[in-house]
């Protein structure tokens, strides 16, 4: 099996080598490599894998997406409850984001072929190192939202505009 995969990978690598810099395929792959920082061989392999999973799972893709997205926070939440610790910010932020994204599960977005792949990829990236990036983005948004949603006095030392 490994030899078959190696042969397929070598054929893909040979096909994807830079040939003509003016070709539209070459420009597309170059842009994708620059944008993602991932080699074109890996991009094509991931796209092929996603397409294969989509074809094989079909109607069960939403179920697998929900199972994958819920596994980590449920496990972490149960560990926190058993140890009777205060919940971490990451767990709370994850559940908030999951609730917001789940609102779109019953809209027109699931009709988009790769919606569940994007959703699963988002949540898998958040469980690894995405929380730092998410916190950088969410702090200004939370401060802005608090100014018009919550009617609370500003913290001491800050003046209202």
Swiss-Prot record:
Stated name of the protein: Uncharacterized protein C06E1.1
Source organism of the structure: Caenorhabditis elegans
């Amino acid at each position: 099996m490994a030899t078959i995969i190696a042969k397929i990978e070598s054929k893909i690598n040979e096909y994807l080598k830079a040939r003509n810099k003016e070709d539209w395929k070459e420009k597309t792959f170059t842009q994708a490599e620059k944008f993602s920082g991932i080699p074109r061989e890996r991009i094509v392999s991931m796209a092929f894998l996603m397409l294969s999973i989509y074809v094989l799972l079909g109607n069960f893709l939403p179920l697998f997406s929900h199972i994958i997205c819920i596994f980590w926070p449920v496990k972490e939440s149960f560990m926190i409850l058993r140890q009777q610790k205060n919940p971490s910010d990451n767990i709370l932020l994850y559940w908030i984001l999951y609730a917001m994204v789940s609102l779109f599960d019953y809209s027109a977005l699931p009709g988009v072929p790769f919606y569940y792949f994007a959703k699963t990829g988002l949540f898998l990236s958040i469980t690894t190192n995405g929380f730092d990036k998410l916190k950088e983005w969410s702090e200004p948004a939370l401060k802005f939202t608090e100014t018009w949603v919550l009617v609370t006095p500003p913290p001491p030392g800050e003046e209202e505009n």
